[in-house]
């Protein structure tokens, strides 16, 4: 079946509508809040009308039917449909702030209870429990530090690569700002020599030639690159065979400016051609 389906789920307030707008801009036929029990019939109907790219968003308001989604997606894959799953998430404090700023109520906050509306943190905890099976199957996007324009850009980048191959997302980050929630693998490179302590390199980044030359001369850096690359070489085929569309490899150093950026650039270059690759520098790009 010549059809690609993108299913967007995630926490309320995480940016699902923004992600859906990105897909609409990219030419997908989009439906928001589709009841899960209608997913298969909707996809088949759209294909009958010669549609080739479809995107649907689902949220916790359809909680009773959400357990049907994994089985339906498996059935679509058996028919030859290219299925991609995105799960948008953010830290609880960010979600609370967004609800406060927009003055919107959480979809589960008005569930009928004798003691009245549920507290926001309680409903968020319940929502995470209900959505956990879908999160496990999807590519997670942590929107905690993303502006709407950055989320739009990132989703478009993800969907710009062919769905038939595994996509590797290499991301640099600063440990002092926290580990991103969307990482599948996290490598700590803070033990490597730090260009920050070289006065002429401090203001530069891991993409600048002087920093690249400095790090290339460090045996520990070369060894770390080899070990991470060999680990990925060993396991990526198995991940691809397990219907994984995306794998996010996060490389962290103290400031997210020199060492992690350099390693991300080198690893992405190593795997380009064999796999789809994307590069994200969280601290440099403001994401």
UniProtKB/Swiss-Prot annotation:
PANTHER family: RNASE ADAPTER PROTEIN RAPZ (PTHR30448:SF0). NCBIfam families: PRK05416.1. Pfam families: PapZ_C, RapZ-like_N. Displays ATPase and GTPase activities. Transmembrane segments: none annotated. HAMAP family: RapZ_like (MF_00636). This is Nucleotide-binding protein Dtpsy_0831. Belongs to the RapZ-like family. Keywords: ATP-binding, GTP-binding, Nucleotide-binding. GTP binds at residues 59-62. SUPFAM superfamilies: P-loop containing nucleoside triphosphate hydrolases. GO terms for molecular function: ATP binding; GTP binding. ATP binds at residues 10-17. The keyword Metal-binding does not apply. It comes from Acidovorax ebreus (strain TPSY).
